[in-house]
Amino acid sequence: MIPKEKELKLIKTYMYICDVYESSLKFYCQRFSNNNHPIFTDQELLTVYLFCGAYQQYFKIKDIHTFTKEYLLSWFPDLPSYQTFNYRLNLMPEAISELVRQLIHSFKPQDCDSMKSLVDSMPIITCAGKNKVGKVATEITSKGYCSTKNMYYFGIKLHAVAFRRKGTIPFPEMLILSAADENDSTVFKRECVGNLNNREIYADKIYSDIPFYKETKEYKKLELFTPVKAIKGESPEITKREKAARDLFSTAVSKVRQPIESLFNWLNEKTNIQRAMKVRSTSGLLVHTMGKIAIALITLIFN
């Protein structure tokens, strides 16, 4: 048994999942086998996963299955074995990614500033420390360097473009996964710039590309602001003369951009998304990453 308040949250989560499943999710988890209508439905599977993560703080699949078996069996009498539960969940990375897109597009807060976006990335670590070769999800992972943590790691990156919100954490507009060794600026220009117009973008120095964004400013009204990078070959006299103005500008940009770091910190605090050391497959890594994002969004939106 669970408290009445959580029963209502469970029902609310299930009803939402059923609505989204009928409109879009079912197209991402269709089956063409004899077991195309399992007794324990995909809607129930997603509800259990999201509810236990968002409201019970269980993130390990084993813990989620155990809690459901002990406390939610009256709600989900057809709960399968742990092995089947885990197998079924790992078949749903595309459905969970679509769920994240639906949550982002359907529940955009009214206080989002549509003219200002913040951009950054965070590492999702499958192995770190002394490991020299990554052996998990090698199709999508690689070795990268995290300057914030001053460490090399194997894994992927989560890139975020988020709407600025005054006085609180930004709300994500786009979320992209890439290999850890891909340059942040390259991923942003390839995956995001084409979908952005009439916008001010605030980002870190690594995104700086003056010739590229000079063009986007002209034909897309898309302007990038980053802290000032040192100019190679510039004379010391000019550097010294411009230092005060550049420092003030860099500080102003950093203040606007800082909340996206708070978004990543909040996401990691809520779900421990960065630690993916227990993952053993590509689909498992995708479920781990997008599933944790879905859990965090459910917590933010439905509370």
Walk through the language-model features, giving the residues of each.
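Short alpha-helical elements
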Residues: 1-303
